[in-house]
């Protein structure tokens, strides 16, 4: 099922009991951040939150934890809310194979209802607050930022839709952090080499299929809009920006048009990041906002970031697993079974594979490290046998504890690249990486003494169903 806009998805969540509307007055700080943290603490079935009465703001509405649970993630895919995680993974992989899905272009969009072209003041337009108490200011952290390759502007796939943290630096200024591993950093370098500003458009309050696509580690020339269409099973709707040639999500609640100022930098940060730590302040580029559009009575969406798990981990979980899975299958089409890279955006990945010969699992681990996402993330790759479910951590721990020999099966590779936000990197952006081979040795490897593994009694599956039926009576 394709949701036409953010509001339609919220309505679907409400119908399924996965949206909690709060009408009592709340304070922007600390209530909004605390409520999102509390929702995450409730477990992997927690609801989205919609606040309609925020102290200090008139008619402001804020949504949080929108896809911060597996039921909500399943509904984003148009699946029943009780769909198991592994089934969501394989369904996402199936839809990934439908990429690219052509887009549907529209002439106008709901956010054109209101247009601000002068005296722009983001402090008046947006209900701003700090997510975590140590943040260095107000941030937009779940907005889709659109930019385009300047060397190949007609290549639709090289238009990027990404999610980057942006600090409100003034009434019409934002600081942005374009880390080197992200496409927008390439676009900014192209602009600054030419001595020109980089046009950008920022969309807030989008339906979750595009925020999911925007946080998926696609190849440089793969379109997030065409991926969003593949995920939802029908063309994704876009509309042209008025100040540039950029395409914008049709269903956005608020849209900001502007440009990154060439050569200009300001101190940005600190900010509580997806790693569960604050990242320190750095000198970062500045966006000048020139025009603002918004729907009547817009809904502002925010993303809580903190110690995992939070909504961020659901948003960048399965959509990180699937590209790694597909890229590994390109190299080993008959062996790769599944990939779990849901933890901290794939800084650790677990790969289930068949083994063709001795040492094969280590080769799989090497390939994972050199995928586009692996280059900037994947610090540790755990490789397990085909009969070990990488989404079942007790099984993975069993494989590590019984199959891995620390002397022979731990491979450490020094001084590889990682995103600078990794708090363990030293210097920032450089780290050692490790492959842990937790597969059963096959010839010509002869170490260990592995007898036939235990299996389940013959009627176990039938008894599982019988017990579930009895529990549900």
From Swiss-Prot:
Give residues annotated as binding prenylated FMN: 160-165, 181-182
Cofactor entry? prenylated FMN; Mn(2+)
| Cellular component aspect of the GO annotation | cytoplasm; cytosol
* Mutant phenotype after disruption: A triple bsdB-bsdC-bsdD deletion mutant no longer converts vanillin to guaiacol, the conversion stops at vanillic acid.
Give the record's GO biological process terms: catabolic process; response to toxic substance; ubiquinone biosynthetic process
Q: How is the cofactor bound?
A: Binds 1 prenylated FMN per subunit.
Superkingdom of origin: Bacteria
Its recorded reaction(s) are:
4-hydroxybenzoate + H(+) = phenol + CO2; vanillate + H(+) = guaiacol + CO2
The enzyme's E.C. designation: 4.1.1.61, 4.1.1.-
Q: What induces it?
A: Up-regulated by salicylate via the transcriptional regulator BsdA.
> Which family, according to the similarity comment?
Belongs to the UbiD family. YclC subfamily.
What other note does the entry give for this protein? It is not known, if phenolic acid decarboxylase forms a complex composed of BsdB, BsdC and BsdD. The term subunit is often used in reference to the operon, however there is no experimental evidence to prove the existence of the complex.
What does this protein's UniProt record list under function? Involved in the non-oxidative decarboxylation and detoxification of phenolic derivatives under both aerobic and anaerobic conditions. Phenolic acid decarboxylase that catalyzes the reversible decarboxylation of 4-hydroxybenzoate and vanillate. Could also catalyze the decarboxylation of salicylate. Is not active on di- and tri-hydroxybenzoate derivatives.
| PANTHER family recorded | 3-OCTAPRENYL-4-HYDROXYBENZOATE CARBOXY-LYASE-RELATED (PTHR30108), FERULIC ACID DECARBOXYLASE 1 (PTHR30108:SF17)
NCBIfam families, alphabetized: UbiD family decarboxylase, VdcC
Q: Which HAMAP family match?
A: UbiD_YclC
Protein name as it appears in the record? Phenolic acid decarboxylase
């Amino acid at each position: 099922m394709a949701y036409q806009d953010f509001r339609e998805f919220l309505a679907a969540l409400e119908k399924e009991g996965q949206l909690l509307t709060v009408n009592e007055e709340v304070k922007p700080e600390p209530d909004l951040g605390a409520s999102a943290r509390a929702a995450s603490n409730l477990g992997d079935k927690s609801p989205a939150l919609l606040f309609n009465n925020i102290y200090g703001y008139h008619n402001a509405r804020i949504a949080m934890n929108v896809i911060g649970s597996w039921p909500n993630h399943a509904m984003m895919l148009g699946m029943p809310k009780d769909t198991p995680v592994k089934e969501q993974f394989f369904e996402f992989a199936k839809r990934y194979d439908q990429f690219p899905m052509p887009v549907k272009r529209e002439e106008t969009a709901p956010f054109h209802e209101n247009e601000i072209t002068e005296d722009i003041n983001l402090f008046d337009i947006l209900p701003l607050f700090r997510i975590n108490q140590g943040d260095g200011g107000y941030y937009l952290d779940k907005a889709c930022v659109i930019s385009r390759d300047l060397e190949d502007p007609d290549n639709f796939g090289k238009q990027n839709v990404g999610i980057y943290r942006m600090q409100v630096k003034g009434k019409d200024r934002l600081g942005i952090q374009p880390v080197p591993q992200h496409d927008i950093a390439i676009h900014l370098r192209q602009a600054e080499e030419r001595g020109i500003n980089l046009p950008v458009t920022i969309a807030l309050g989008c339906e979750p299929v595009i925020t999911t696509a925007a946080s998926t580690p696609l190849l440089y020339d793969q379109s997030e809009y065409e991926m969003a269409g593949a995920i939802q099973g029908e063309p994704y709707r876009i509309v042209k920006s008025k100040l540039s040639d950029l395409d914008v999500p049709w269903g956005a609640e608020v849209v900001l048009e502007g440009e990154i100022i060439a050569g200009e930098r300001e101190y940005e940060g600190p900010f509580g990041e997806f790693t569960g730590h604050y990242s320190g302040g750095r000198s970062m580029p500045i966006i000048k906002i020139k025009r603002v559009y918004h729907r009547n009575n817009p809904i502002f969406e925010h993303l809580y970031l903190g110690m995992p798990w939070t909504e961020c981990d659901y948003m960048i979980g399965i959509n990180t697993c699937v590209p790694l899975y597909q890229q590994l299958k390109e190299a080993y089409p008959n062996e790769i079974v599944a990939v779990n890279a849901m933890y901290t955006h794939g800084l650790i990945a677990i790969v289930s594979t068949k083994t063709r010969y001795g040492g094969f699992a280590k080769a799989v681990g090497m390939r994972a490290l050199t995928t586009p996402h692996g280059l900037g993330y994947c610090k540790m790759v755990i490789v397990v046998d085909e009969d070990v479910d990488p989404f079942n951590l007790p099984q993975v721990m069993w494989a590590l504890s019984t199959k891995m020999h620390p002397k022979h099966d731990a491979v450490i590779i020094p001084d590889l690249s990682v995103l600078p936000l990794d708090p363990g990197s030293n210097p920032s952006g450089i780290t050692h990486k490790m492959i842990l081979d937790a597969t059963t040795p096959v010839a010509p490897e002869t170490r260990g003494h592995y007898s036939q593994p235990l299996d389940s009694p013959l009627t176990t599956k039938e008894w599982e169903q019988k017990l579930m039926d009895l529990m549900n009576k």
